[in-house]
Amino acid sequence: MKSIKLISFLDIKNDSLVTNKLKKDNTVFLKQGSLDGACGPYCLFMTLIILGLIDYDHAINLWWTKRNSKFGKMVYKMQEHGTLFQKGTHLKQLKVLLEYSFQSKLELNVSKEKGKRLINFCIEQLKQNKPTIIGINGSDLSHWLLAVGFEKNEKGEVSKLFFLDPSGNDIPNYWNATIEVKKKHRGRYPYSWIDFAEDRFVNLEDGISLGLK
């Protein structure tokens, strides 16, 4: 029988995905703007909300955050890259943002692997209840997604990874993006992102998980 594993901090209430680590202002999903390249920071913010380190109001009003707070330090560091991260972010930059701000609160695990090895890293982190930010690359795509769970098939093998995609739709569900990881295709981009009318083929490259100390 198929089974699904999700990060235990997540719940659905009042038509929204929320975190049970906060009692109020606990909506998780953040919608990325169509003109910015800040998918990485959006994934960071959603992870911080899930872990109860910031709330939704902090995230949507980030430029008003007190500079001496942990989140304020992150926002200040972000300004070095321009307001909208138009050129996107790399794994090293995401790690620096976290180390500069929430290092005392978080246990970070970084993987520079790709493909199957990165998938295995992601699965192990999710088993430990750690949201995991994963890089996705395709022929015309470079993007960050936030992994929040996985599906096992009838043989007990992980067949799909479930993500929150900041560029996707805000729906009352635990995830809004799915990548098939058991069945591989030939070529540079062997995995199917199956949330489209026609599958998009991608590879998974680089990841960072966040857990509470």
Predicted regions and their residues:
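Short, well-structured alpha-helical interface segments that form or flank functional binding sites
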Residues: 34, 38, 89, 117, ...
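Generic short alpha-helical segment signal, independent of protein family or function
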Residues: 52, 99, 103, 205-206, ...
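Active-site-adjacent substructure of cysteine-protease-like catalytic cores
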Residues: 110-164
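Active-site nucleophile-adjacent alpha helix/oxyanion-hole segment immediately C-terminal to the catalytic cysteine
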Residues: 1-77
